[in-house]
């Protein structure tokens, strides 16, 4: 199992628009060309760091020495460690929660398996540590810590790495989204049709993949990276660019933390490969591939969940559902997620306009309204997948609940869109964007 040995060292950076070639340096897998003139607000970008650590990046190098492992340290974590060693007090010290907040958070965790779990409230109660707190609880409640003999301190350190490698300034692709997907995955792992077949390894893989599936997301989509000639797009040959990066980053953190170092090498290699297969399945461009295969299995009634391959396939489907389940939440939460993802689209559109690039589909705030985007997303992406998931679960209580929320939320967006058109005197179709437009915009499709 190879791993891209990288040093993540800064967020989205754009070259001067006067240059003939415009490119983007995304947080992750990036080599800076200079040490001076780095804007102070860029996360983890400090000129005193020795940028030679970023050199000699390879696509398939094995990690065999401590020196190589050190390259996997993210720039942000490297900076935090180095300034602490120099005796500099962090600018944002840890604020401890009072007992009232901790008590409320613990009470919420007692209901973590319910579909109306409010991840936004939970994130506030945990002072922005929803992902770490949730995963520590789930690893314990599923018996994974005992089964895999995981060290609690090492587990916590790894989870903090994952949480910190999400960009808090992203409206949508941030650690709260990862926590929301993880909570949904937990609910799906409890579905009776699936739960009785799952092994501890399946459960751990599902939770880890859900938590890390968008780690280090730059807040722009794959087409943006391709048209700006970003080096990650070249590295992964324009195929599942972000998903490959999320996977490689996850493996880097697993190895750096040594969370699984006590397990047999063959087992850790298998875990890394399966995590890759799960995370890569979230590529929206593969939606039809997975949907067609799921329909065929259900039609032929040939799913054998005692078979590891079939079980892994259903874990992929479960993760895909968890990743795009926002429209199936209650309206108050679903609406908030919709506004967040569209805000992220619009920010990308603003960047494209600023640098005289063609504005990507769904990213033009003047033309692409939130109701229109969401109606198309629900119609062409969410509904087909969740209908098949309901067939698989035998129309379980949770599946019926999700489809009910989906229908209600779609009606709400149609009503809002109709009101918008009445105000504008437009007779535009209420169907939303075409499916090919949605698939072109990875992430609209959150």
From Swiss-Prot:
Superkingdom of this protein's organism: Eukaryota
Enzyme Commission number(s) of this protein: 3.1.4.53
InterPro entries for the chain: HD/PDEase_dom, PDEase, PDEase_catalytic_dom, PDEase_catalytic_dom_sf, PDEase_CS
Name of the protein in its database record: 3',5'-cyclic-AMP phosphodiesterase 7B
Residues the record marks as active site: 173
Top enzyme class: hydrolase
Matching Gene3D superfamilies: 3'5'-cyclic nucleotide phosphodiesterase, catalytic domain
Family, as annotated: Belongs to the cyclic nucleotide phosphodiesterase family. PDE7 subfamily.
Pathway involvement of the protein, from the record: Purine metabolism; 3',5'-cyclic AMP degradation; AMP from 3',5'-cyclic AMP: step 1/1
Source organism per UniProt: Mus musculus
